UniProtKB/Swiss-Prot annotation:
It catalyses: isopentenyl diphosphate = dimethylallyl diphosphate. Disulfide bonds: none annotated. InterPro entries: Aldolase_TIM, FMN-dep_DH, IPdP_isomerase. This is Isopentenyl-diphosphate delta-isomerase. It comes from Listeria monocytogenes serotype 4b (strain CLIP80459). The gene is fni.
Length: 358
């Protein structure tokens, strides 16, 4: 029985990657397209003046992008994790591994995650677990990678679509609070592509969580992945569940939103998307599916070159926004239009204030 469970988990990991890459071949319209920065025609700064450094859970990093959790737990994904670790090392960006539950249940899979630290010995690495994982097991996940931080992913929609997924969730908040109090490294609570509302963020802030990853709809769709894995595909009605990254970011502009650090991920496609997310308060921006897609189609070297180009392009966008650093970018005026503006108005977000901030 244990062997069958292990094989099922390994197959699931491989299917996640294959289906995730397929999704990224043709991207749907993004809610971030409804966000427009108000720039300048007479910049105050030169490109060389721009400072892209940011802080993630107390660690200073030189560029506001990280490789978000996606994979690990099978022979095939070990190779992918090794290549992602090389990209993270050469581009000097943090990296999160995929859920480590497989390795916690089957020690023969530990190396599929540990390879990340072997290839990137000095980089910022985030371990990744579910709130189903008991504290002592979670500490093993941190040790496995000598991790700098711990991601706890919350994914009820994915679990419900997954035939072998969890069906009990009421203990999650207590478990997360336990990690916040006892983890030897900082904790980031992240969604997996269904987005966090400000109410969810407040619930987490109330138990001591200091950083969340809003992880909205628009990137890899795990409801679709799990539904595609089912023979009956019985959950096709749930494929559009959740809020987009743009909606999650706008929701955090409400006057009652908790004042904690947040990261943004889900449907980030280019440097302009990064700038928009940072301008709406994110400290850094995560990508998973698009980086794996680039890796699969173009290889490690081309993906690193793309990220280096993005750094230069990002500096140019900061110049156009009249912002020397991320702190200044967060005061840049923004116009919210289209469906995102309608959604924001219904959520009582002061869009006029956003459009006229200084």
């Amino acid at each position: 029985m244990q062997k069958n469970d292990d094989l099922l988990r390994e197959r699931r990991k491989d299917e996640h990657v294959a289906l995730g890459v397929k999704q990224n071949e043709q991207l749907a319209p993004s809610s971030l397209e409804d966000i427009q920065l108000i720039g300048t025609s007479i910049p105050r700064y030169n490109v060389k003046d721009i400072d892209l450094t940011t802080t993630i859970v107390g660690t200073n990093v030189p560029f506001p992008l990280y490789i978000n959790a996606m994979t690990g737990g099978s022979r095939h994904t070990k190779k992918i994790n090794a290549e992602l670790a090389e990209i993270a090392r050469e581009a000097a960006i943090p990296m999160a591994v995929g859920s480590q539950s497989a390795a916690l249940k089957n020690s023969s899979l530990i190396d599929t995650y540990k390879i990340v630290r072997e290839i990137n010995p000095n980089g910022m690495i985030l371990a990744n677990i579910s709130p189903e994982v008991a504290l002592q097991e979670g500490l093993r996940a941190i040790e496995m990678l000598e991790a700098n931080a711990l991601q706890i992913h919350i994914n009820p929609a994915q679990e419900l679509v997954m035939q072998e997924g969890d069906r009990s969730f009421s203990h999650w908040l207590t478990r997360i609070e336990e990690y916040v109090k006892l983890s030897p490294v900082p904790v980031v609570v992240k969604e997996v592509g269904f987005g966090m509302t400000r109410e969810t963020v407040k619930t987490l802030a109330d138990i001591g969580v200091q950083t969340v990853d809003l992880a909205g709809k628009g990137g890899t769709n795990f409801a679709q992945i799990e539904n595609d894995r089912r023979r009956d595909q019985a959950y096709d009605f749930l494929l559009d569940w959740g809020i987009s990254t743009g909606q999650a970011l706008i929701d955090m502009q409400h006057q009652d939103a908790p004042k904690i650090a947040y990261l943004a991920s889900g449907g980030i496609r280019n440097p302009l998307d990064i700038v928009k997310a940072l301008a709406l308060g994110a400290d850094s921006v995560g990508m998973a599916g698009q980086i794996i897609y680039s890796l699969k189609k173009e290889g490690v070297t081309k993906t690193i070159e793309k990220l280096e180009l993005w750094k230069e392009q990002l500096r140019g966008l900061f110049v156009l926004a009249n912002a020397k650093n991320i702190s200044e970018l967060k005061t840049t005026p923004l116009i919210i239009s289209g469906e995102l503006a309608k959604w924001g108005a219904l959520r009582e977000i002061d869009l006029v204030k956003l459009a006229n901030r200084k």
